[in-house]
């Protein structure tokens, strides 16, 4: 979600200047620096949680987030991952087994890096919370979704006239639906109950291509994914250190991985996690890379069929862009899972490493850092820009990709204002490169062969609010 740049925040607050103003040319004193020389984004634990931890904006290339002065956004197509959540039941089982080993020594005084355990309690109240979106703490999932909707109202509110009913779309999974509802409340405000129409799209395989969550059950490129070990040498070092500080725990490298998974979820429910400091920065770097491998080989470009899965959304959004707001509409807000966004990026051909990621070491500098791609609440926004002529570009329609509120250049197509891509070029590139989903994934001819719900939607408000109690471990897909 949009955040004011730390670089200029103090100046903007003090003077009312633009967030991109650089302030006075002459410092107030000879010792005062106009710009800080300290940048610590790479040390942020939020960038090494993989897809488990709270939302954070993508590290940008410095391209202005606002549209260029010669342009106006006239259409927005967004897909957002659900907000921050508790671990899944399967992850919870592994976490509880690792914690059982930690507590097996029956000590009254933990030592060293685990000294905080003398006062710590597990943040999951009981097993019914597994899978659920979090509602407590400053990083809570539902709070994230509401704030995001509110931020996008400020950014894109001009695309709604305040009167028409706007459809928005969620896959049929409990926490995804709740994210969509909270986002809708944030965006539409008092008008949510009357002017927003939530459409829930089943996650069933029989939906074929008419889905936010298309599947590829004939996938024949899962060997690497199926054999990932989720281990790097640093986890053995961590296990040895913790075992030496508190003898008798007998933690293994696998236990360390599961404890780090637990730690990476804790901030989703609490404002602070002592578990972060139980592991070193280097160990967190290794953990983040292990998560990168998981997404890359299981739901990203490391699986050759994922581009075809993502082509469903990429191709349908291309149709919207070419139809434009007058024919198709201006606002398309969609909600799904992390592993539905990564195939879309693969289909678009962005953030693709030059070679497959190595399994035995961290590939520093590779573009596939999942903490920058799909953290909790992560989102990909496609902007259609209507631009006036400038000294560098012609009047016309352009396309911009924005990933987690950072402009993501569309590979080599950056000749437009604000490094955008001319719509005609964007169209040509995708038409040439997008694989065919139904052929690649051998989709049954009895299933829908293309995405149609953006054009065939309901305008009723009956699904805007839940009508039943929250079930234990809610998260099962709805048919």
UniProtKB/Swiss-Prot annotation:
GO cellular component: fungal-type cell wall
A Pfam family matched in the record: His_Phos_2
Keyword Nucleotidyltransferase on entry: no
EC id: 3.1.3.8
Catalyzed reaction equations: 1D-myo-inositol hexakisphosphate + H2O = 1D-myo-inositol 1,2,4,5,6-pentakisphosphate + phosphate
Superkingdom of the source species: Eukaryota
Active site as annotated: 82 (nucleophile), 338 (proton donor)
Endpoints of the signal sequence: 1-19
Residues with attached carbohydrate: 191, 315, 458
Cysteine disulfide links: 71-387, 128-472, 216-441, 225-298, 413-421
Keyword Glycoprotein: yes
Keywords: Disulfide bond, Glycoprotein, Hydrolase, Signal
Top EC class for this record: hydrolase
Single GO MF annotation: acid phosphatase activity
CDD domains, A to Z: HP_HAP_like
Entry similarity comment: Belongs to the histidine acid phosphatase family.
PANTHER family from the UniProt entry: ACID PHOSPHATASE PHO11-RELATED, MULTIPLE INOSITOL POLYPHOSPHATE PHOSPHATASE-RELATED
Subunit structure: Homodimer.
Protein function: Catalyzes the hydrolysis of inorganic orthophosphate from phytate.
Protein name: 3-phytase B
């Amino acid at each position: 979600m949009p955040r004011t740049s730390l670089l200029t925040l103090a100046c903007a607050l003090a003077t009312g200047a633009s967030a991109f103003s650089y302030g006075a040319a002459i410092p107030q004193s000879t010792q005062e620096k106009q710009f800080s020389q300290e940048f610590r984004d790479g040390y942020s634990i939020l960038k090494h949680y993989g897809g488990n931890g709270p939302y954070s904006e993508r590290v940008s290339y410095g391209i202005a987030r606002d549209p260029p002065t010669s342009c106006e956004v006239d259409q927005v197509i967004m897909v957002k991952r659900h907000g921050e959540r508790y671990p899944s039941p399967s992850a919870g089982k592994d976490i509880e087994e690792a914690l059982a080993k930690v507590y097996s020594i029956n000590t009254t005084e933990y030592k060293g890096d685990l000294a905080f355990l003398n006062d710590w309690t597990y943040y999951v109240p009981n097993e019914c919370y597994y899978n659920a979106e979090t509602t407590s703490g400053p990083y809570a999932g539902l709070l994230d979704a509401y704030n995001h909707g509110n931020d996008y109202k400020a950014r894109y509110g001009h695309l709604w006239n305040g009167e028409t009913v706007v459809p928005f779309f969620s896959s049929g999974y409990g926490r995804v639906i709740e994210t969509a509802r909270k986002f809708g409340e944030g965006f539409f405000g008092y008008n949510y109950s009357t002017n927003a129409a939530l459409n829930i799209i089943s996650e069933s395989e029989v939906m074929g291509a008419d889905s936010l969550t298309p599947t590829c059950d004939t996938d024949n490129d899962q060997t690497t994914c199926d054999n990932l070990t989720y281990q790097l040498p640093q986890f053995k070092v961590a296990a040895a250190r913790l075992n030496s500080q508190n003898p008798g725990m007998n933690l293994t490298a696998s236990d360390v991985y599961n404890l780090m998974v637990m730690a990476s979820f804790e901030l989703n429910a609490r404002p602070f996690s002592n578990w972060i400091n139980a592991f070193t920065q280097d160990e967190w770097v290794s953990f983040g890379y292990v998560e990168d491998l998981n997404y890359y080989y299981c739901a990203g470009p490391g699986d050759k069929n994922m581009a075809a899965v993502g082509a469903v959304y990429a191709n349908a959004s291309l149709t919207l862009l070419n139809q434009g707001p007058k024919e198709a509409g201006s606002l398309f807000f969609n909600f799904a899972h992390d592993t539905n966004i990564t195939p879309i990026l693969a289909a678009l051909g962005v953030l693709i490493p030059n070679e497959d990621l190595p399994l035995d070491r961290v590939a520093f500098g590779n573009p596939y850092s999942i903490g920058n791609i799909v953290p909790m609440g992560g989102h990909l926004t496609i902007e259609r820009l209507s631009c006036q002529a400038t000294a560098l570009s012609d009047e016309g329609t352009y396309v911009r990709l924005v990933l987690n509120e950072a402009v993501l250049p569309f590979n080599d197509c950056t000749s437009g204002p604000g490094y955008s891509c001319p719509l005609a070029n964007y169209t040509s590139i995708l038409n040439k490169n997008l694989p065919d989903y139904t052929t690649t994934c051998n989709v049954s001819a009895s299933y829908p062969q293309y995405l149609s719900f953006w054009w065939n939607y309901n305008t009723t408000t009956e699904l805007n609010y839940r009508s039943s109690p929250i079930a234990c471990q809610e998260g099962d897909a709805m048919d």
